[in-house]
Amino acid sequence: VITTKPCATSRDLALAYTPGVAEPCIEIKKNPDDAYKYTAKGNLVAVVSNGTAVLGLGDIGALAGKPVMEGKGVLFKRFADIDVFDIELDTKDSDELIRTVKLLEPTFGGINLEDIKGPECFYIEEELKKIMNIPVFHDDQHGTAIISAAGMLNAVEIVGKQIEKCKIVVNGAGDAGIACANLA
């Protein structure tokens, strides 16, 4: 935990915890959106995985996938100054994963699903988007699709063509391939 407010004096600590912490609690109770004002929620993302589709390694499980999720957190922090908790869930049951992530909603400002195999990843993301009031993003689908589209747009610009006149082939029907096709 990195403090964002002063914590040097007894007064500082009394504001951070008891009795001062009661004020933001009361405000958040009145208006839940104030959680983004008074807490770290707005800059905190959960990177969630069950380790069933780790790039280049396959289904290695939640614990073995932990270094990848921690690494993803480093990228979030380094390039966007977003704080991350990696959450490795030891389950292959999609509904159990969905229930667990939903229960974490009060803590996080967003959910980044990572390295969850298809076709389960489609169902999990779709259901979470229906039931959660924070952004849910499946990196392996949409991150890849966005980067692929950006690369295509840059390539078309470099060769002086119009994208509308190009034939684009999506070679593959995995999570990323389907997301690339859906983006078009």
Regions from the PLM with identified roles:
Residues 51, 90-93, 142, 172-177:
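Acidic, glycine-rich active-site loops and adjacent beta-strand->loop/helix elements
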